[in-house]
Every structure is written in C-alpha cells, then in structure tokens.
Amino acid sequence: LKQYQAGLLTIKINNGGITNVSNTYSSPERTVIIVDGIFMKETPFNANWSFDINNTDDQFKFIGHVGKLELSDMNVFLTPLLNAKVKGEVIASNFTINGNFDESVINISQEFKDVDVTLLNKKKKEKELLSAVANAVLNDNSGEKGNLLHNATTQAKRDRTKSFFNYLAKNLINGVKVNFLRKNNTVTKEKKKKRN
C-alpha cells in the first residue's frame, strides 16, 4: 500500500456563536453558526453557516471571507500531499456555498498576485519543465495592479462517507482550481469595488 504523508492545516477559532439551536423552530427559521479566527499563520477569516434543522434535504448556506494569505504558508499542506510548492499572495477571498446533503454550488471571488507553482519529484527537487507548463496555464494575477477580482462558479458532490468539513474543503478546492485556471470559460472578471 502506498502511504501518503499528511498535510497540515492550522485553524484557530477566536470567537463563535450559535443561534436557534433546537428542532422546535419552524421553517424558515434557521440555525446560524458564526465564527472568526486565524487560518494558517496569520490570515484572518470569518464564516456564517446557516441551515434549517427540519429540512430533510439538509439544505445549507455557508458564507466565508478569508483575508490576506501568503501562499507559501500553504506549503506545509500542499507539499506532502501534492509534491508542489506555491508562492504569491491571495489578497482576499469571498465565497458562498449553497448546497444540500448530496451536492452544492460555490460562488467564489478572489484577488491575487504573483502566483507561482513549483512541481517537485519524490526527492523534493523541482521538475522544471512541468513547473513551466503549470505556470503557463495558471493565472498569476487577478488583474493589472490588483484592480480586478476573479469570479468563478462551480459544483461539488459530497462523499457521504466523509464529514461536512471534507465537503466544505472539496467546494473550496474546486472553486480555487477554476479561479486560477486561465483557460476556463466559467471564469469572469469584474472591477474590484473601491473600499471606503
């Protein structure tokens, strides 16, 4: 059997709250879980997960915002699993997942710059040709001088043998893959809204 070394993700919850925790509420009243914290080294995030506990299809909505992420912080996760390293910066990510027990749709928008991928062999040495090909098909910036958001919509199917958090991760991975691929027709661009 081939063994895989585990990748490491670090999530620290700073604050959290739950409202309407009971099966006595009637639709459309929803249970709402709100959390904020730190992802990996110092990336702030917040999330709002809502669902109707009486809905037999387990319909839910998960809204999240992830702040500035140095992509090199992700290498402790990516290198053991994928024999890859990344660098660059995701300035902001916003996403909404609407789904049920079986399938979901994620809408994700991201601002990013200077993205670069290095593919590695088993000895963790760079595969130069494959790395060059990978970088040729990736978006390295979301727009000139960071003035564009990349928006993407994609889907995920749930593996019923795994947890909701595996399902959430699958949505995010699918969304990020679509967003970073240059030649994918589902990606659209729009001007970033000016912050007040």
For each predicted feature, which ranges?
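Extended terminal
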Residues: D52, H65, V76-F77, L82-N196
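Elongated, acidic membrane-bridging lipid-handling scaffolds
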Residues: L1-F60
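Flexible, solvent-exposed coil segments and beta strand-coil junctions
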Residues: S26-R30, S72-F77
